Amino acid sequence: MSDLVLGLDIGIGSVGVGILNKVTGEIIHKNSRIFPAAQAENNLVRRTNRQGRRLARRKKHRRVRLNRLFEESGLITDFTKISINLNPYQLRVKGLTDELSNEELFIALKNMVKHRGISYLDDASDDGNSSVGDYAQIVKENSKQLETKTPGQIQLERYQTYGQLRGDFTVEKDGKKHRLINVFPTSAYRSEALRILQTQQEFNPQITDEFINRYLEILTGKRKYYHGPGNEKSRTDYGRYRTSGETLDNIFGILIGKCTFYPDEFRAAKASYTAQEFNLLNDLNNLTVPTETKKLSKEQKNQIINYVKNEKAMGPAKLFKYIAKLLSCDVADIKGYRIDKSGKAEIHTFEAYRKMKTLETLDIEQMDRETLDKLAYVLTLNTEREGIQEALEHEFADGSFSQKQVDELVQFRKANSSIFGKGWHNFSVKLMMELIPELYETSEEQMTILTRLGKQKTTSSSNKTKYIDEKLLTEEIYNPVVAKSVRQAIKIVNAAIKEYGDFDNIVIEMARETNEDDEKKAIQKIQKANKDEKDAAMLKAANQYNGKAELPHSVFHGHKQLATKIRLWHQQGERCLYTGKTISIHDLINNSNQFEVDHILPLSITFDDSLANKVLVYATANQEKGQRTPYQALDSMDDAWSFRELKAFVRESKTLSNKKKEYLLTEEDISKFDVRKKFIERNLVDTRYASRVVLNALQEHFRAHKIDTKVSVVRGQFTSQLRRHWGIEKTRDTYHHHAVDALIIAASSQLNLWKKQKNTLVSYSEDQLLDIETGELISDDEYKESVFKAPYQHFVDTLKSKEFEDSILFSYQVDSKFNRKISDATIYATRQAKVGKDKADETYVLGKIKDIYTQDGYDAFMKIYKKDKSKFLMYRHDPQTFEKVIEPILENYPNKQINEKGKEVPCNPFLKYKEEHGYIRKYSKKGNGPEIKSLKYYDSKLGNHIDITPKDSNNKVVLQSVSPWRADVYFNKTTGKYEILGLKYADLQFEKGTGTYKISQEKYNDIKKKEGVDSDSEFKFTLYKNDLLLVKDTETKEQQLFRFLSRTMPKQKHYVELKPYDKQKFEGGEALIKVLGNVANSGQCKKGLGKSNISIYKVRTDVLGNQHIIKNEGDKPKLDF
């Protein structure tokens, strides 16, 4: 082996890399790999956009089918003879009783085809639990109105009363605000359409029964959600008709994972009887109870399971009470259960089975295991009536369930979606059926049994190469954020092995959070909680000490631990937790030698130096307690309260953390190796799911290839302790800290504690620690120093040095992908106008104040009005309305009012007018002009855009926020200057005929000319986002490395926006090399590169940050993809 250690600090959007020689401590390599974190929110945006396009496409297709139906049925329409302003809702209501012309019928039916309601509301209306929440309550009110009216009648009534019918809006009714939502079930639209068509059939013989049935099919027809797209003739792997020729019953069935140990078996539903029994048995086997064996017997487990199954209500508290009664012990004596995020006990309770026992038409207790498991499979996989009914018919071909039973199961599934929504177990029914007898007979948990039975986890790791397949490794990591970070890390491991050979050790630390925003919020939350607690402690201490808000600064002189002691004093309710005595703040400040900060459990056992393992106690009590736990020591101490008294006090405390409570009340024998191992796993080793996946996959890979690389995953809190003890400050302003953390992680594998953890370190008879290396007895402080002592001389000094910091390499994931979003989806209208100081007509994008009656709408109006009211289109094109309606309202109605608390607050004059007279109307002699709800204005001059103007439009229609893609760099030998050509995603398109996605040479040449690139200029290279760019001043020899962001400022030739090499952004006004000047005060670095006396080079890096300078990248740019 190479004596090298690889440390990896895997973050959400970064991987720190550190390689050192474990013998000499020499730092071999260090770099930070930076990449954009995977954002689940982006997937949501894409899904929503796809859904919108799909809905629009289907609506369009229904309209086409309606046109075809009218043509094929001989219903001729001529819209040149009727008004284009016919109200479809009036026609729908009219059609219920009176004759409609062909044109009127078409308009009415087309309106319903476009807006046909929501199909799943038909099931929800029968669901007794659906009326939870405001939205559901309003839908329920809509359903009540449907008992006497059609959707069309309700919609027309709302339109005539409130001037609005679509969407979600609030109106005033009987002086109260009332929310209305235009949501009705598809079945209501079907009933309305049927009534209209049956009425029209009386007047028009061409409306036949066949016509009615075909229309109703167009109106209500819907592909089954579990079938997906495609059909027998047009197969696709996105639907049930696979390209392989296979036809699936349910497309979601293929998403069920395979068993971890039996790869041919599907995983069981978590709601299956077998999974519920398995989970509870595993929980019971993990419990430690006050019996001779410390475990539950087979008979006791049977009793507990029968009890749980037959109780209507069951939770952890009730179950633990039963177990305590069964064992004749206290609930507090039961240990080893799982804890949720809020610190509460967790245990499986046969929830799904107990709920299913409430079914009235089915006798669940009489069903066998196989039937219950199948039923759970059906109810987990399917969510709606159609899917459930079809699956029951398929799975139970003997017709086991009557329609009445099916109906109840459908409603049961809807009412208990949280139970069946938990998904799938990691194991198959086959594997669990093998393990359940073992769980009854032994006190072992699942993994121990699997190991004993010789079950091997199946892996698809390839032995063909010694490099790790990152795709295979991340198959079991379902969080996309974590999976992306791990993939990047594995690429780094492979590159490091390729460059440096096999490693002796690989040590990994993984991010705590899985979202960048969540990570920031979590850090802020912890920092705020700590600050609040410190402030509260100091305030209480000051009030009691001198009756003021602050303690005198002098009390802290020569007393460096006083702040910590005061915080612990506050946490502990001003008591010594070993003696139970009250601690006076005056004694704590003036007689500091009386008190000490003690580790509740020895640091040599827990490796936990956090505040959670510390208490403030009398020095005499601390000496007497020694290296024992409170449980072991208190009842034998002369001047201490009993352990029972401590237990009662700790349980009642609101200020002690859950972890501290656990440490104070532990009754485990810390001299035993398995107890020590548990603390090591808790405080040193990261046992989270994703961390275990990475650890196991790497270990299995190296084992399969007979490589003796030891892999470990450590907790972030441990490396944080090392940072603190070594005095290495962490600044997040730059990306250096990732590499520094990685080296600390690598060095952590060489600490003395790793060498000593398997030895019996504590001599409990003398309450001292034995130094195995020297044979000398050492104190707790000396042991602490030994544990946290840096493994190499000058290692810490090196990490702190400026020379070391400057030598760290950085590598960025370059974004060269070509099929990204080309622009925002918002469609903008434009107009030609002279605005402000314009000397000629310019093209302006129109803005819109959507609702002038909201406070935000009024504020937006006033902002434009005060600056330049001529920006409003109404001011120019309808001056009478602006001068005789809008401005008088502004003059006569207030813009401020006194609220309920007597305070002056802003208000909206337009809203005040509306409350008195209704909507503002355009000026007319009779005062009945159209209602005004919004106002358009000239917003900004048209810049970069995509033209989507229809052929018959007089004004441009555009998309804005056009996204830049890449920049091609050219060199003009005549002028001696570089020229930059910017390309956007919108410049790419599919070539007609070939279907190739590309930029045509003709279009490229047009852009080249527009960008000021000479036809004879020499192509140098292409820059994508996050490519590195080296700029050299050929006169002064100064040079600086940048990250390329984009070609910018399109009206300025050859300008680009740059980012710093070693951090996220520049400081405002930051100095660059002289030829480029300074960064703008805003922090943006936009610079023209068309200068004399500079040289530009592309710098390509690998994942380890190794740099390769590129002067030329081929003869011509790539235009085909």
Curated annotation (Swiss-Prot):
<keyword id="KW-0378">Hydrolase</keyword>
<dbReference type="InterPro" id="IPR036397">
    <property type="entry name" value="RNaseH_sf"/>
</dbReference>
<dbReference type="InterPro" id="IPR040656">
    <property type="entry name" value="Cas9_WED_dom"/>
</dbReference>
<dbReference type="Pfam" id="PF18070">
    <property type="entry name" value="Cas9_PI2"/>
</dbReference>
<keyword id="KW-0255">Endonuclease</keyword>
<dbReference type="GO" id="GO:0004519">
    <property type="term" value="F:endonuclease activity"/>
</dbReference>
<protein>
    <recommendedName>
        <fullName>CRISPR-associated endonuclease Cas9 1</fullName>
        <ecNumber>3.1.-.-</ecNumber>
    </recommendedName>
</protein>
<dbReference type="GO" id="GO:0046872">
    <property type="term" value="F:metal ion binding"/>
</dbReference>
<dbReference type="InterPro" id="IPR003615">
    <property type="entry name" value="HNH_nuc"/>
</dbReference>
<feature type="binding site">
    <location>
        <position position="738"/>
    </location>
    <ligand>
        <name>Mg(2+) 2</name>
    </ligand>
</feature>
<keyword id="KW-0464">Manganese</keyword>
<feature type="active site" description="Proton acceptor for HNH nuclease domain">
    <location>
        <position position="599"/>
    </location>
</feature>
<comment type="similarity">
    <text>Belongs to the CRISPR-associated protein Cas9 family. Subtype II-A subfamily.</text>
</comment>
<dbReference type="GO" id="GO:0003677">
    <property type="term" value="F:DNA binding"/>
</dbReference>
<dbReference type="InterPro" id="IPR041383">
    <property type="entry name" value="RuvC_III"/>
</dbReference>
<keyword id="KW-0540">Nuclease</keyword>
<keyword id="KW-0051">Antiviral defense</keyword>
<feature type="domain" description="HNH Cas9-type">
    <location>
        <begin position="516"/>
        <end position="684"/>
    </location>
</feature>
<feature type="binding site">
    <location>
        <position position="9"/>
    </location>
    <ligand>
        <name>Mg(2+) 2</name>
    </ligand>
</feature>
<keyword id="KW-0694">RNA-binding</keyword>
<keyword id="KW-0238">DNA-binding</keyword>
<comment type="function">
    <text>CRISPR (clustered regularly interspaced short palindromic repeat) is an adaptive immune system that provides protection against mobile genetic elements (viruses, transposable elements and conjugative plasmids). CRISPR clusters contain spacers, sequences complementary to antecedent mobile elements, and target invading nucleic acids. CRISPR clusters are transcribed and processed into CRISPR RNA (crRNA). In type II CRISPR systems correct processing of pre-crRNA requires a trans-encoded small RNA (tracrRNA), endogenous ribonuclease 3 (rnc) and this protein.</text>
</comment>
<dbReference type="Pfam" id="PF18061">
    <property type="entry name" value="CRISPR_Cas9_WED"/>
</dbReference>
<keyword id="KW-0479">Metal-binding</keyword>
<feature type="active site" description="For RuvC-like nuclease domain">
    <location>
        <position position="9"/>
    </location>
</feature>
<keyword id="KW-0460">Magnesium</keyword>
<dbReference type="InterPro" id="IPR028629">
    <property type="entry name" value="Cas9"/>
</dbReference>
<dbReference type="Pfam" id="PF18470">
    <property type="entry name" value="Cas9_a"/>
</dbReference>
<dbReference type="GO" id="GO:0003723">
    <property type="term" value="F:RNA binding"/>
</dbReference>
<feature type="binding site">
    <location>
        <position position="9"/>
    </location>
    <ligand>
        <name>Mg(2+) 1</name>
    </ligand>
</feature>
<comment type="subunit">
    <text>Monomer. Binds crRNA and tracrRNA.</text>
</comment>
<dbReference type="InterPro" id="IPR040555">
    <property type="entry name" value="Cas9_PI2"/>
</dbReference>
<dbReference type="GO" id="GO:0051607">
    <property type="term" value="P:defense response to virus"/>
</dbReference>
<dbReference type="GO" id="GO:0043571">
    <property type="term" value="P:maintenance of CRISPR repeat elements"/>
</dbReference>
<dbReference type="Pfam" id="PF13395">
    <property type="entry name" value="HNH_4"/>
</dbReference>
<feature type="binding site">
    <location>
        <position position="513"/>
    </location>
    <ligand>
        <name>Mg(2+) 1</name>
    </ligand>
</feature>
<dbReference type="InterPro" id="IPR033114">
    <property type="entry name" value="HNH_CAS9"/>
</dbReference>
<dbReference type="InterPro" id="IPR040619">
    <property type="entry name" value="Cas9_alpha-helical_lobe"/>
</dbReference>
<feature type="binding site">
    <location>
        <position position="509"/>
    </location>
    <ligand>
        <name>Mg(2+) 1</name>
    </ligand>
</feature>
<dbReference type="Pfam" id="PF18541">
    <property type="entry name" value="RuvC_III"/>
</dbReference>
<feature type="binding site">
    <location>
        <position position="513"/>
    </location>
    <ligand>
        <name>Mg(2+) 2</name>
    </ligand>
</feature>
